[in-house]
Amino acid sequence: MYAVIKTGGKQYKVAAGEKIKVEQIAADVGQEIVIDQVLAVGEGSAIKVGTPLVSGATVTVTVLSHGRHDKVRIFKMRRRKHYQKRQGHRQNFTELQIGAIVG
């Protein structure tokens, strides 16, 4: 069984037992969270697609860890104008373990 969930402004296709990295969620490590923004649920060839959400469908996840992605370097330059600007960014993430999918 799999589901398509929405969290942090992005959509993820998940199945029970998988680990995913999502945008940072304000929760403690080891805490269980119920995600109710389920866009689709499927098993085999049968699929339920929500409009926009599947009513009554939930995905239970456990917070494994919090961390930061690798640094992304931004470099801006204007040719012939002696203008250069360097900037770096590291995005925070939360690693989740997918538990039960109900729907």
Swiss-Prot record:
One GO cellular component term: ribonucleoprotein complex
List UniProt keywords, sorted A-Z.
Answer: Ribonucleoprotein, Ribosomal protein, RNA-binding, rRNA-binding
Keyword GTP-binding attached: no
Query: What Pfam families does this protein map onto?
Result: Ribosomal_L21p (PF00829)
Alphabetically, which GO biological process terms does the record hold? translation
Q: How does it assemble?
A: Part of the 50S ribosomal subunit. Contacts protein L20.
NCBIfam families per the UniProt record, alphabetical: L21 (TIGR00061)
UniProt name for this protein: Large ribosomal subunit protein bL21
Highest classification ranks of the organism: Bacteria, Pseudomonadati, Pseudomonadota, Betaproteobacteria, Burkholderiales
Whichever gene encodes this chain, its name is rplU
